[in-house]
Amino acid sequence: MRKTLAFSLLLWWGQSAFGLSLDQYPQASRFIERMASRYRFDPASLRSLFAEAQIKPSIIEVMSRPAEAKPWYEYRKIFLTERRIQEGVRFWQRYRDLLKQAERVYGVPPEIIVAILGVETLYGANTGSFRVLDALSTLAFAYPRRAEYFARELEQFLLLTREERLDPRNPQGSYAGAMGWPQFMPSSFRQYAADFDGDGKRDIWKNPADVIGSVANYFAQSGWQSRHPVATRLPRRAESLANTDLNPKFTLAELKRLGVPLAPYPDTLTANVIKLDGENSPEIWLGFHNFYVITRYNRSLLYAMAVHQLAETIKSRLEEMQHAQKN
């Protein structure tokens, strides 16, 4: 029995993909019934659509791997690369007017928008090669551990394709169903994607205006505070206050009373003390409310710090180039 089961699993994993059978996946049939009753989708059309969907064992394999936790000094090297910095400068130069417009409308500075796109997809170069329909169907119907979440995202995907008049067979994205240059999940697309150029479509796959406007809108709706700081380095003696909370838990007035030396920021600002693994010794940082807002995009302190440092590096590099051109 065990040998037969093991052989069957080997055969299953060895397949690159196979069709989604409604007989094999009754949860898919229940999903179709729910979409029909709740959102008035045509059941026959959905059955036809899912007959073309493919279950991808490679996606299950990737999702099932244990997450590898890297220390900050290794994580940083992935994103703070010369290529990512140079291409970020070029992206900023190429779309300067759109970035300025997004800052006027949403209050989000260009460097944050540029850094998000740099970290997520290398400015649109690596947006994923899976059909979103296949990725979300695989995870909704063949990955029980997170089936509920991905079924909701599949629901949102079908709704957005109907709203945007897209063929659900066409959009491509990551193995988890994240889409476009900013890697929005379908629920995020429906809430935050912006038609920034007013052409009647929200295109985060090919339209730089919509990409930039959508990222800016995401941050604005998540509570970005215009012209407020993101993070600043602290001396090691503040280490005892460090914690892993994402939400800011101190006012600056409280931190000053606790002996944390701070630049002249308003006492009412909120922040948190963060400890990261440096290569030789811990790095202690103060993450303000805007640092927390970055974690709304990806709930990781390391991710938020990578975005912040990439943003500051790109901005500094661009300013150096502009200064050199004037002299």
Question: How does the language model describe each region?
Answer:
Residues M1-T4:
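Positively charged n-region of N-terminal signal peptides that target proteins for export
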Residues W13-S16:
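N-terminal signal peptide c-region/cleavage motif recognized by signal peptidases
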Residues L20-R94, K100-E103:
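An acidic, Gly/Ser/Thr/Pro-rich helix-cap/linker signature
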Residues Q27, R34-E52, A147, A151-Q172, ...:
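A contiguous strand-loop segment
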Residues Q54, E120-G124, A178, R237-A238, ...:
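Solvent-exposed loop/turn segments at secondary-structure junctions
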Residues Y75-S214, A220:
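Acidic/His-rich structured neighborhood in mature extracellular/periplasmic domains
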Residues P168-E279:
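Flexible, glycine-rich surface segments
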Residues A271, L276-N327:
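C-terminal functional modules
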